[in-house]
From Swiss-Prot:
Annotated stretches, region: Disordered: 297-356, 1160-1220
The EC number(s) this enzyme carries: 7.2.2.10
Protein name per the record: Plasma membrane calcium-transporting ATPase 1
UniProt-annotated catalytic positions: D475 (4-aspartylphosphate intermediate)
CDD domains: P-type_ATPase_Ca_PMCA-like
Source organism of this protein record: Sus scrofa (Pig)
Amino acid sequence: MGDMANNSVAYGGVKNSLKEANHDGDFGITLADVRALMELRSTDALRKIQESYGDVYGICTRLKTSPVEGLSGNPADIERREAVFGKNFIPPKKPKTFLQLVWEALQDVTLIILEIAAIVSLGLSFYQPPEGDNALCGEVSVGEEEGEGETGWIEGAAILLSVVCVVLVTAFNDWSKEKQFRGLQSRIEQEQKFTVIRGGQVIQIPVADITVGDIAQVKYGDLLPADGILIQGNDLKIDESSLTGESDHVKKSLDKDPLLLSGTHVMEGSGRMVVTAVGINSQTGIIFTLLGAGGEEEEKKDEKKKEKKNKKQDGAIENRNKAKAQDGAAMEMQPLKSEEGGDGDEKDKKKANLPKKEKSVLQGKLTKLAVQIGKAGLLMSAITVIILVLYFVIDTFWVQKRPWLAECTPIYIQYFVKFFIIGVTVLVVAVPEGLPLAVTISLAYSVKKMMKDNNLVRHLDACETMGNATAICSDKTGTLTMNRMTVVQAYINEKHYKKIPEPEAIPPNILSYLVTGISVNCAYTSKILPPEKEGGLPRHVGNKTECALLGLLLDLKRDYQDVRNEIPEEALYKVYTFNSVRKSMSTVLKNSDGSYRIFSKGASEIILKKCFKILSANGEAKVFRPRDRDDIVKTVIEPMASEGLRTICLAFRDFPAGEPEPEWDNENDIVTGLTCIAVVGIEDPVRPEVPDAIKKCQRAGITVRMVTGDNINTARAIATKCGILHPGEDFLCLEGKDFNRRIRNEKGEIEQERIDKIWPKLRVLARSSPTDKHTLVKGIIDSTVSDQRQVVAVTGDGTNDGPALKKADVGFAMGIAGTDVAKEASDIILTDDNFTSIVKAVMWGRNVYDSISKFLQFQLTVNVVAVIVAFTGACITQDSPLKAVQMLWVNLIMDTLASLALATEPPTESLLLRKPYGRNKPLISRTMMKNILGHAFYQLVVVFTLLFAGEKFFDIDSGRNAPLHAPPSEHYTIVFNTFVLMQLFNEINARKIHGERNVFEGIFNNAIFCTIVLGTFVVQIIIVQFGGKPFSCSELSIEQWLWSIFLGMGTLLWGQLISTIPTSRLKFLKEAGHGTQKEEIPEEELAEDVEEIDHAERELRRGQILWFRGLNRIQTQIRVVNAFRSSLYEGLEKPESRSSIHNFMTHPEFRIEDSEPHIPLIDDTDAEDDAPTKRNCSPPPSPNKNNNAVDSGIYLTIEMNKSATSSSPGSPLHSLETSL
């Protein structure tokens, strides 16, 4: 100890001279030395430090830093260090270029078919049959005699052009989406700070500013941002599984294993380290470089590997890769992650770490709906083509009895190509490729706006899942309460003080114990700083409960800092840090005479049980019997708790000098036989806005439960203040022990039936451990008591909340109080730790659902009308009234633009006035079905009237039966124009889906909507007036325009008529877009794990499932082999630590499946058996191994189906899984 003090003193003297002398950055240790040192482990590292540098302080001296004061913080010095040792930043993978996104958008099957048809049409249009044979080829050539032949190429060219438009729009959408995510990443990066000592001051700096030589303070729950060597530690335990795959926590100490590695988690204790490697030179950085985060060669290898893989896997993965717009090396790494990343982990952790299946209800429903609509569209388009071809063949060769002439063949083919294009056009309009786009836009827009409501969304689909939430399990401290704690009552020298006593009232020796005990037995990182603003409240830094105790000392006019200066942190002999199992903290001091004194603080009932004495009124210790303890509980602790106070007991124990050295590792023998100093009551007031927010939740059909570590009386009092409990209601409040007793059988196993008896009535779970929280969440999610599977949101802030946060449908981590580990496991980070922000998330989630429904209502109306018009028109008049190019324009309005317009509606409070939709609620309600069919009826009547009687009404030439390549007719232009205007006005109707009357309500709050509607109208005018031949349009007069607009506006009036008809009367209406019902699932599947099977998967029969299991198994083996091969090429990378937020955030390749430390990312645990890189061979305890295999297998089919039915490539539904 003294040695260290001298060291720092000596250092302080030379510090400045060293800095001046070495202005060229000539440190006593090179980057290569540091890297080599950090790659060693435990004893090797110690040996190397001792041989080369003497000790840690030797390294500090060479790095020109003081172990006590830290760096000076001088900008020139920091710059020099960054130049020599690098910055703490890992360069992200280059984003996809716009051209790459364009190429991806071109992969769409429908677009490819159209391109081929257009090229064939182009080629054939240049063929002229020999003169004289014209008459023999039938009416084909009528148009050509009028000199129209040379314009035949225009249609083909126009189709190509519109395909280009669609591709550009899709690519632009993807590009802006990727840009947005990158912005979000950098935001998360900037928010992550770490505590370092600079110039003797403890400050927080952004992780990217940490540099080699910094002295960093590490504490429980931190995620280490750089590599370092321990200078001083208290009971420090690190989870290194993200780097080594070993799940046991590693104990770090100066004499055994002082190396701390970036990307690992501090699970217990605290300490200080000197930073030795940052950025790409840290262990995490080295692995990232191996994985090709920066390397060009790796990218090329990836390309090759991907090509091979795509061939082998039938292109199915190609789609998945597309979906994950920022994939990169993630695919290659998946097997490595799962094999080497933390196998034999504890059971509950393992379960929590299996990827969450059936994450997004909406995706499942939409996939199913899109596939159904796609199939119908394919059928319609096929029938259309067959009818057209048959009609033409019969008419030409049968009725007109024409011979087949060789020179007429190209003209006949031209006809067939025209029919084919009409068929494809029907398909283009029928396939709702805008659905995935609408979902993505809606979610991306919501995510952006949710930032303002203090929700930082890390996984897109969490936002939508929140709309379905039926239960919220919330922490108490900081979420429901203000987390500004103050001691308001105390039991000292056998008196219960209702307010803090004057220091004179307390015997001096008791006061002395109190001051020393609180000062040294609170983490040295906890302190009270002066207010930022004049007249404001003092700032509490660190653990808020400890700050309350330090505040008590200030109220007693004593300064804790004096004690800490006298006993610096290094002088503490042993520290038993606080964790959720101990629920207490103890610190041992060694006195000059060789005796020891231990101070303990913790939950009052836990510490009091260990007290055998108590300090009496005169300051002497007297015997403390169980009877006395019960008295204190009844007269002091329970009254405090019933007022909502958290009770903390402070105690101490002396170990005399003469006795043999205590066995310090045997904590139970050390922390016992204590003497009680005092019991204090700490108040943490309820946030004023919480009761109202909870009322909103209850009105919205969401049950709020409180899970807390506090004692049951405190918890009950706070729950009543918040409105979670109402006096006189029959709800349960349980303690963790009681809860466990009720849900376990004689063997101590948890039984679902027992949980099912408890959770519906449970409102408060007190004195609970993180395991209890996980058990409760799992129990509610797995329960089958209610018709609907519960959707559970959970808040968490501690390191051990990880499993519960992962198990929940949506995990909320605290942005302020939360540890990095909790943030890693979460889906959404609450930047203000406030419960009301969760209510906002519910609102946004429901809004996403409604936005998608609005879009569906609009899109399906257009689909129905366009398909029927194209089909009937083609069958009756041999030509689609809406040409291919016009259909593509309609498709653009209806897909891309409408999804933008309708998916960006802001949410309103009224969303909280209804119950959650539930998992099986159909996407298209009966009211929506009524609207869709009603509007489709109106539009079809208008279009067919114009088609078959329009020429008489407007007194123009009929456009029906026009020959090939005839010029565009006014007649068909009016049909097209009216059709588009009806869609435009119907877009306004689509804004309301619950049968509201006023469709204009709040329309001006949505600027995007207004811009798109007006913009579309302007473009429509340009197309009709100046589009000419390419768009098959001829100019219209003012009168014709007015008629078109009038018929378009008719949809608004018609909408009012429809909303007057009560839906309940229309018994024949069916809902659509269901989640899947139970009877559709084979029984074995249900038995495996009912709710873990994805909606879209349930359609598949058992045979298919087995078949895909086989396929998937092969696919996985290929994937593992490839990964293994790549790992050999790339210098046998170690499994990377994706677990650090700042790294994870800089790397798009890890954005996809999120950076959960030990998740087997191959979707099935089966695969791990084949994995050559596997370390521990114990099979993971998965509740449903087979199911996982089914899972990925079927994922595959849906992707195939989807690609077959043309989903717009840049945004297949799975792009939603892009983690933020």
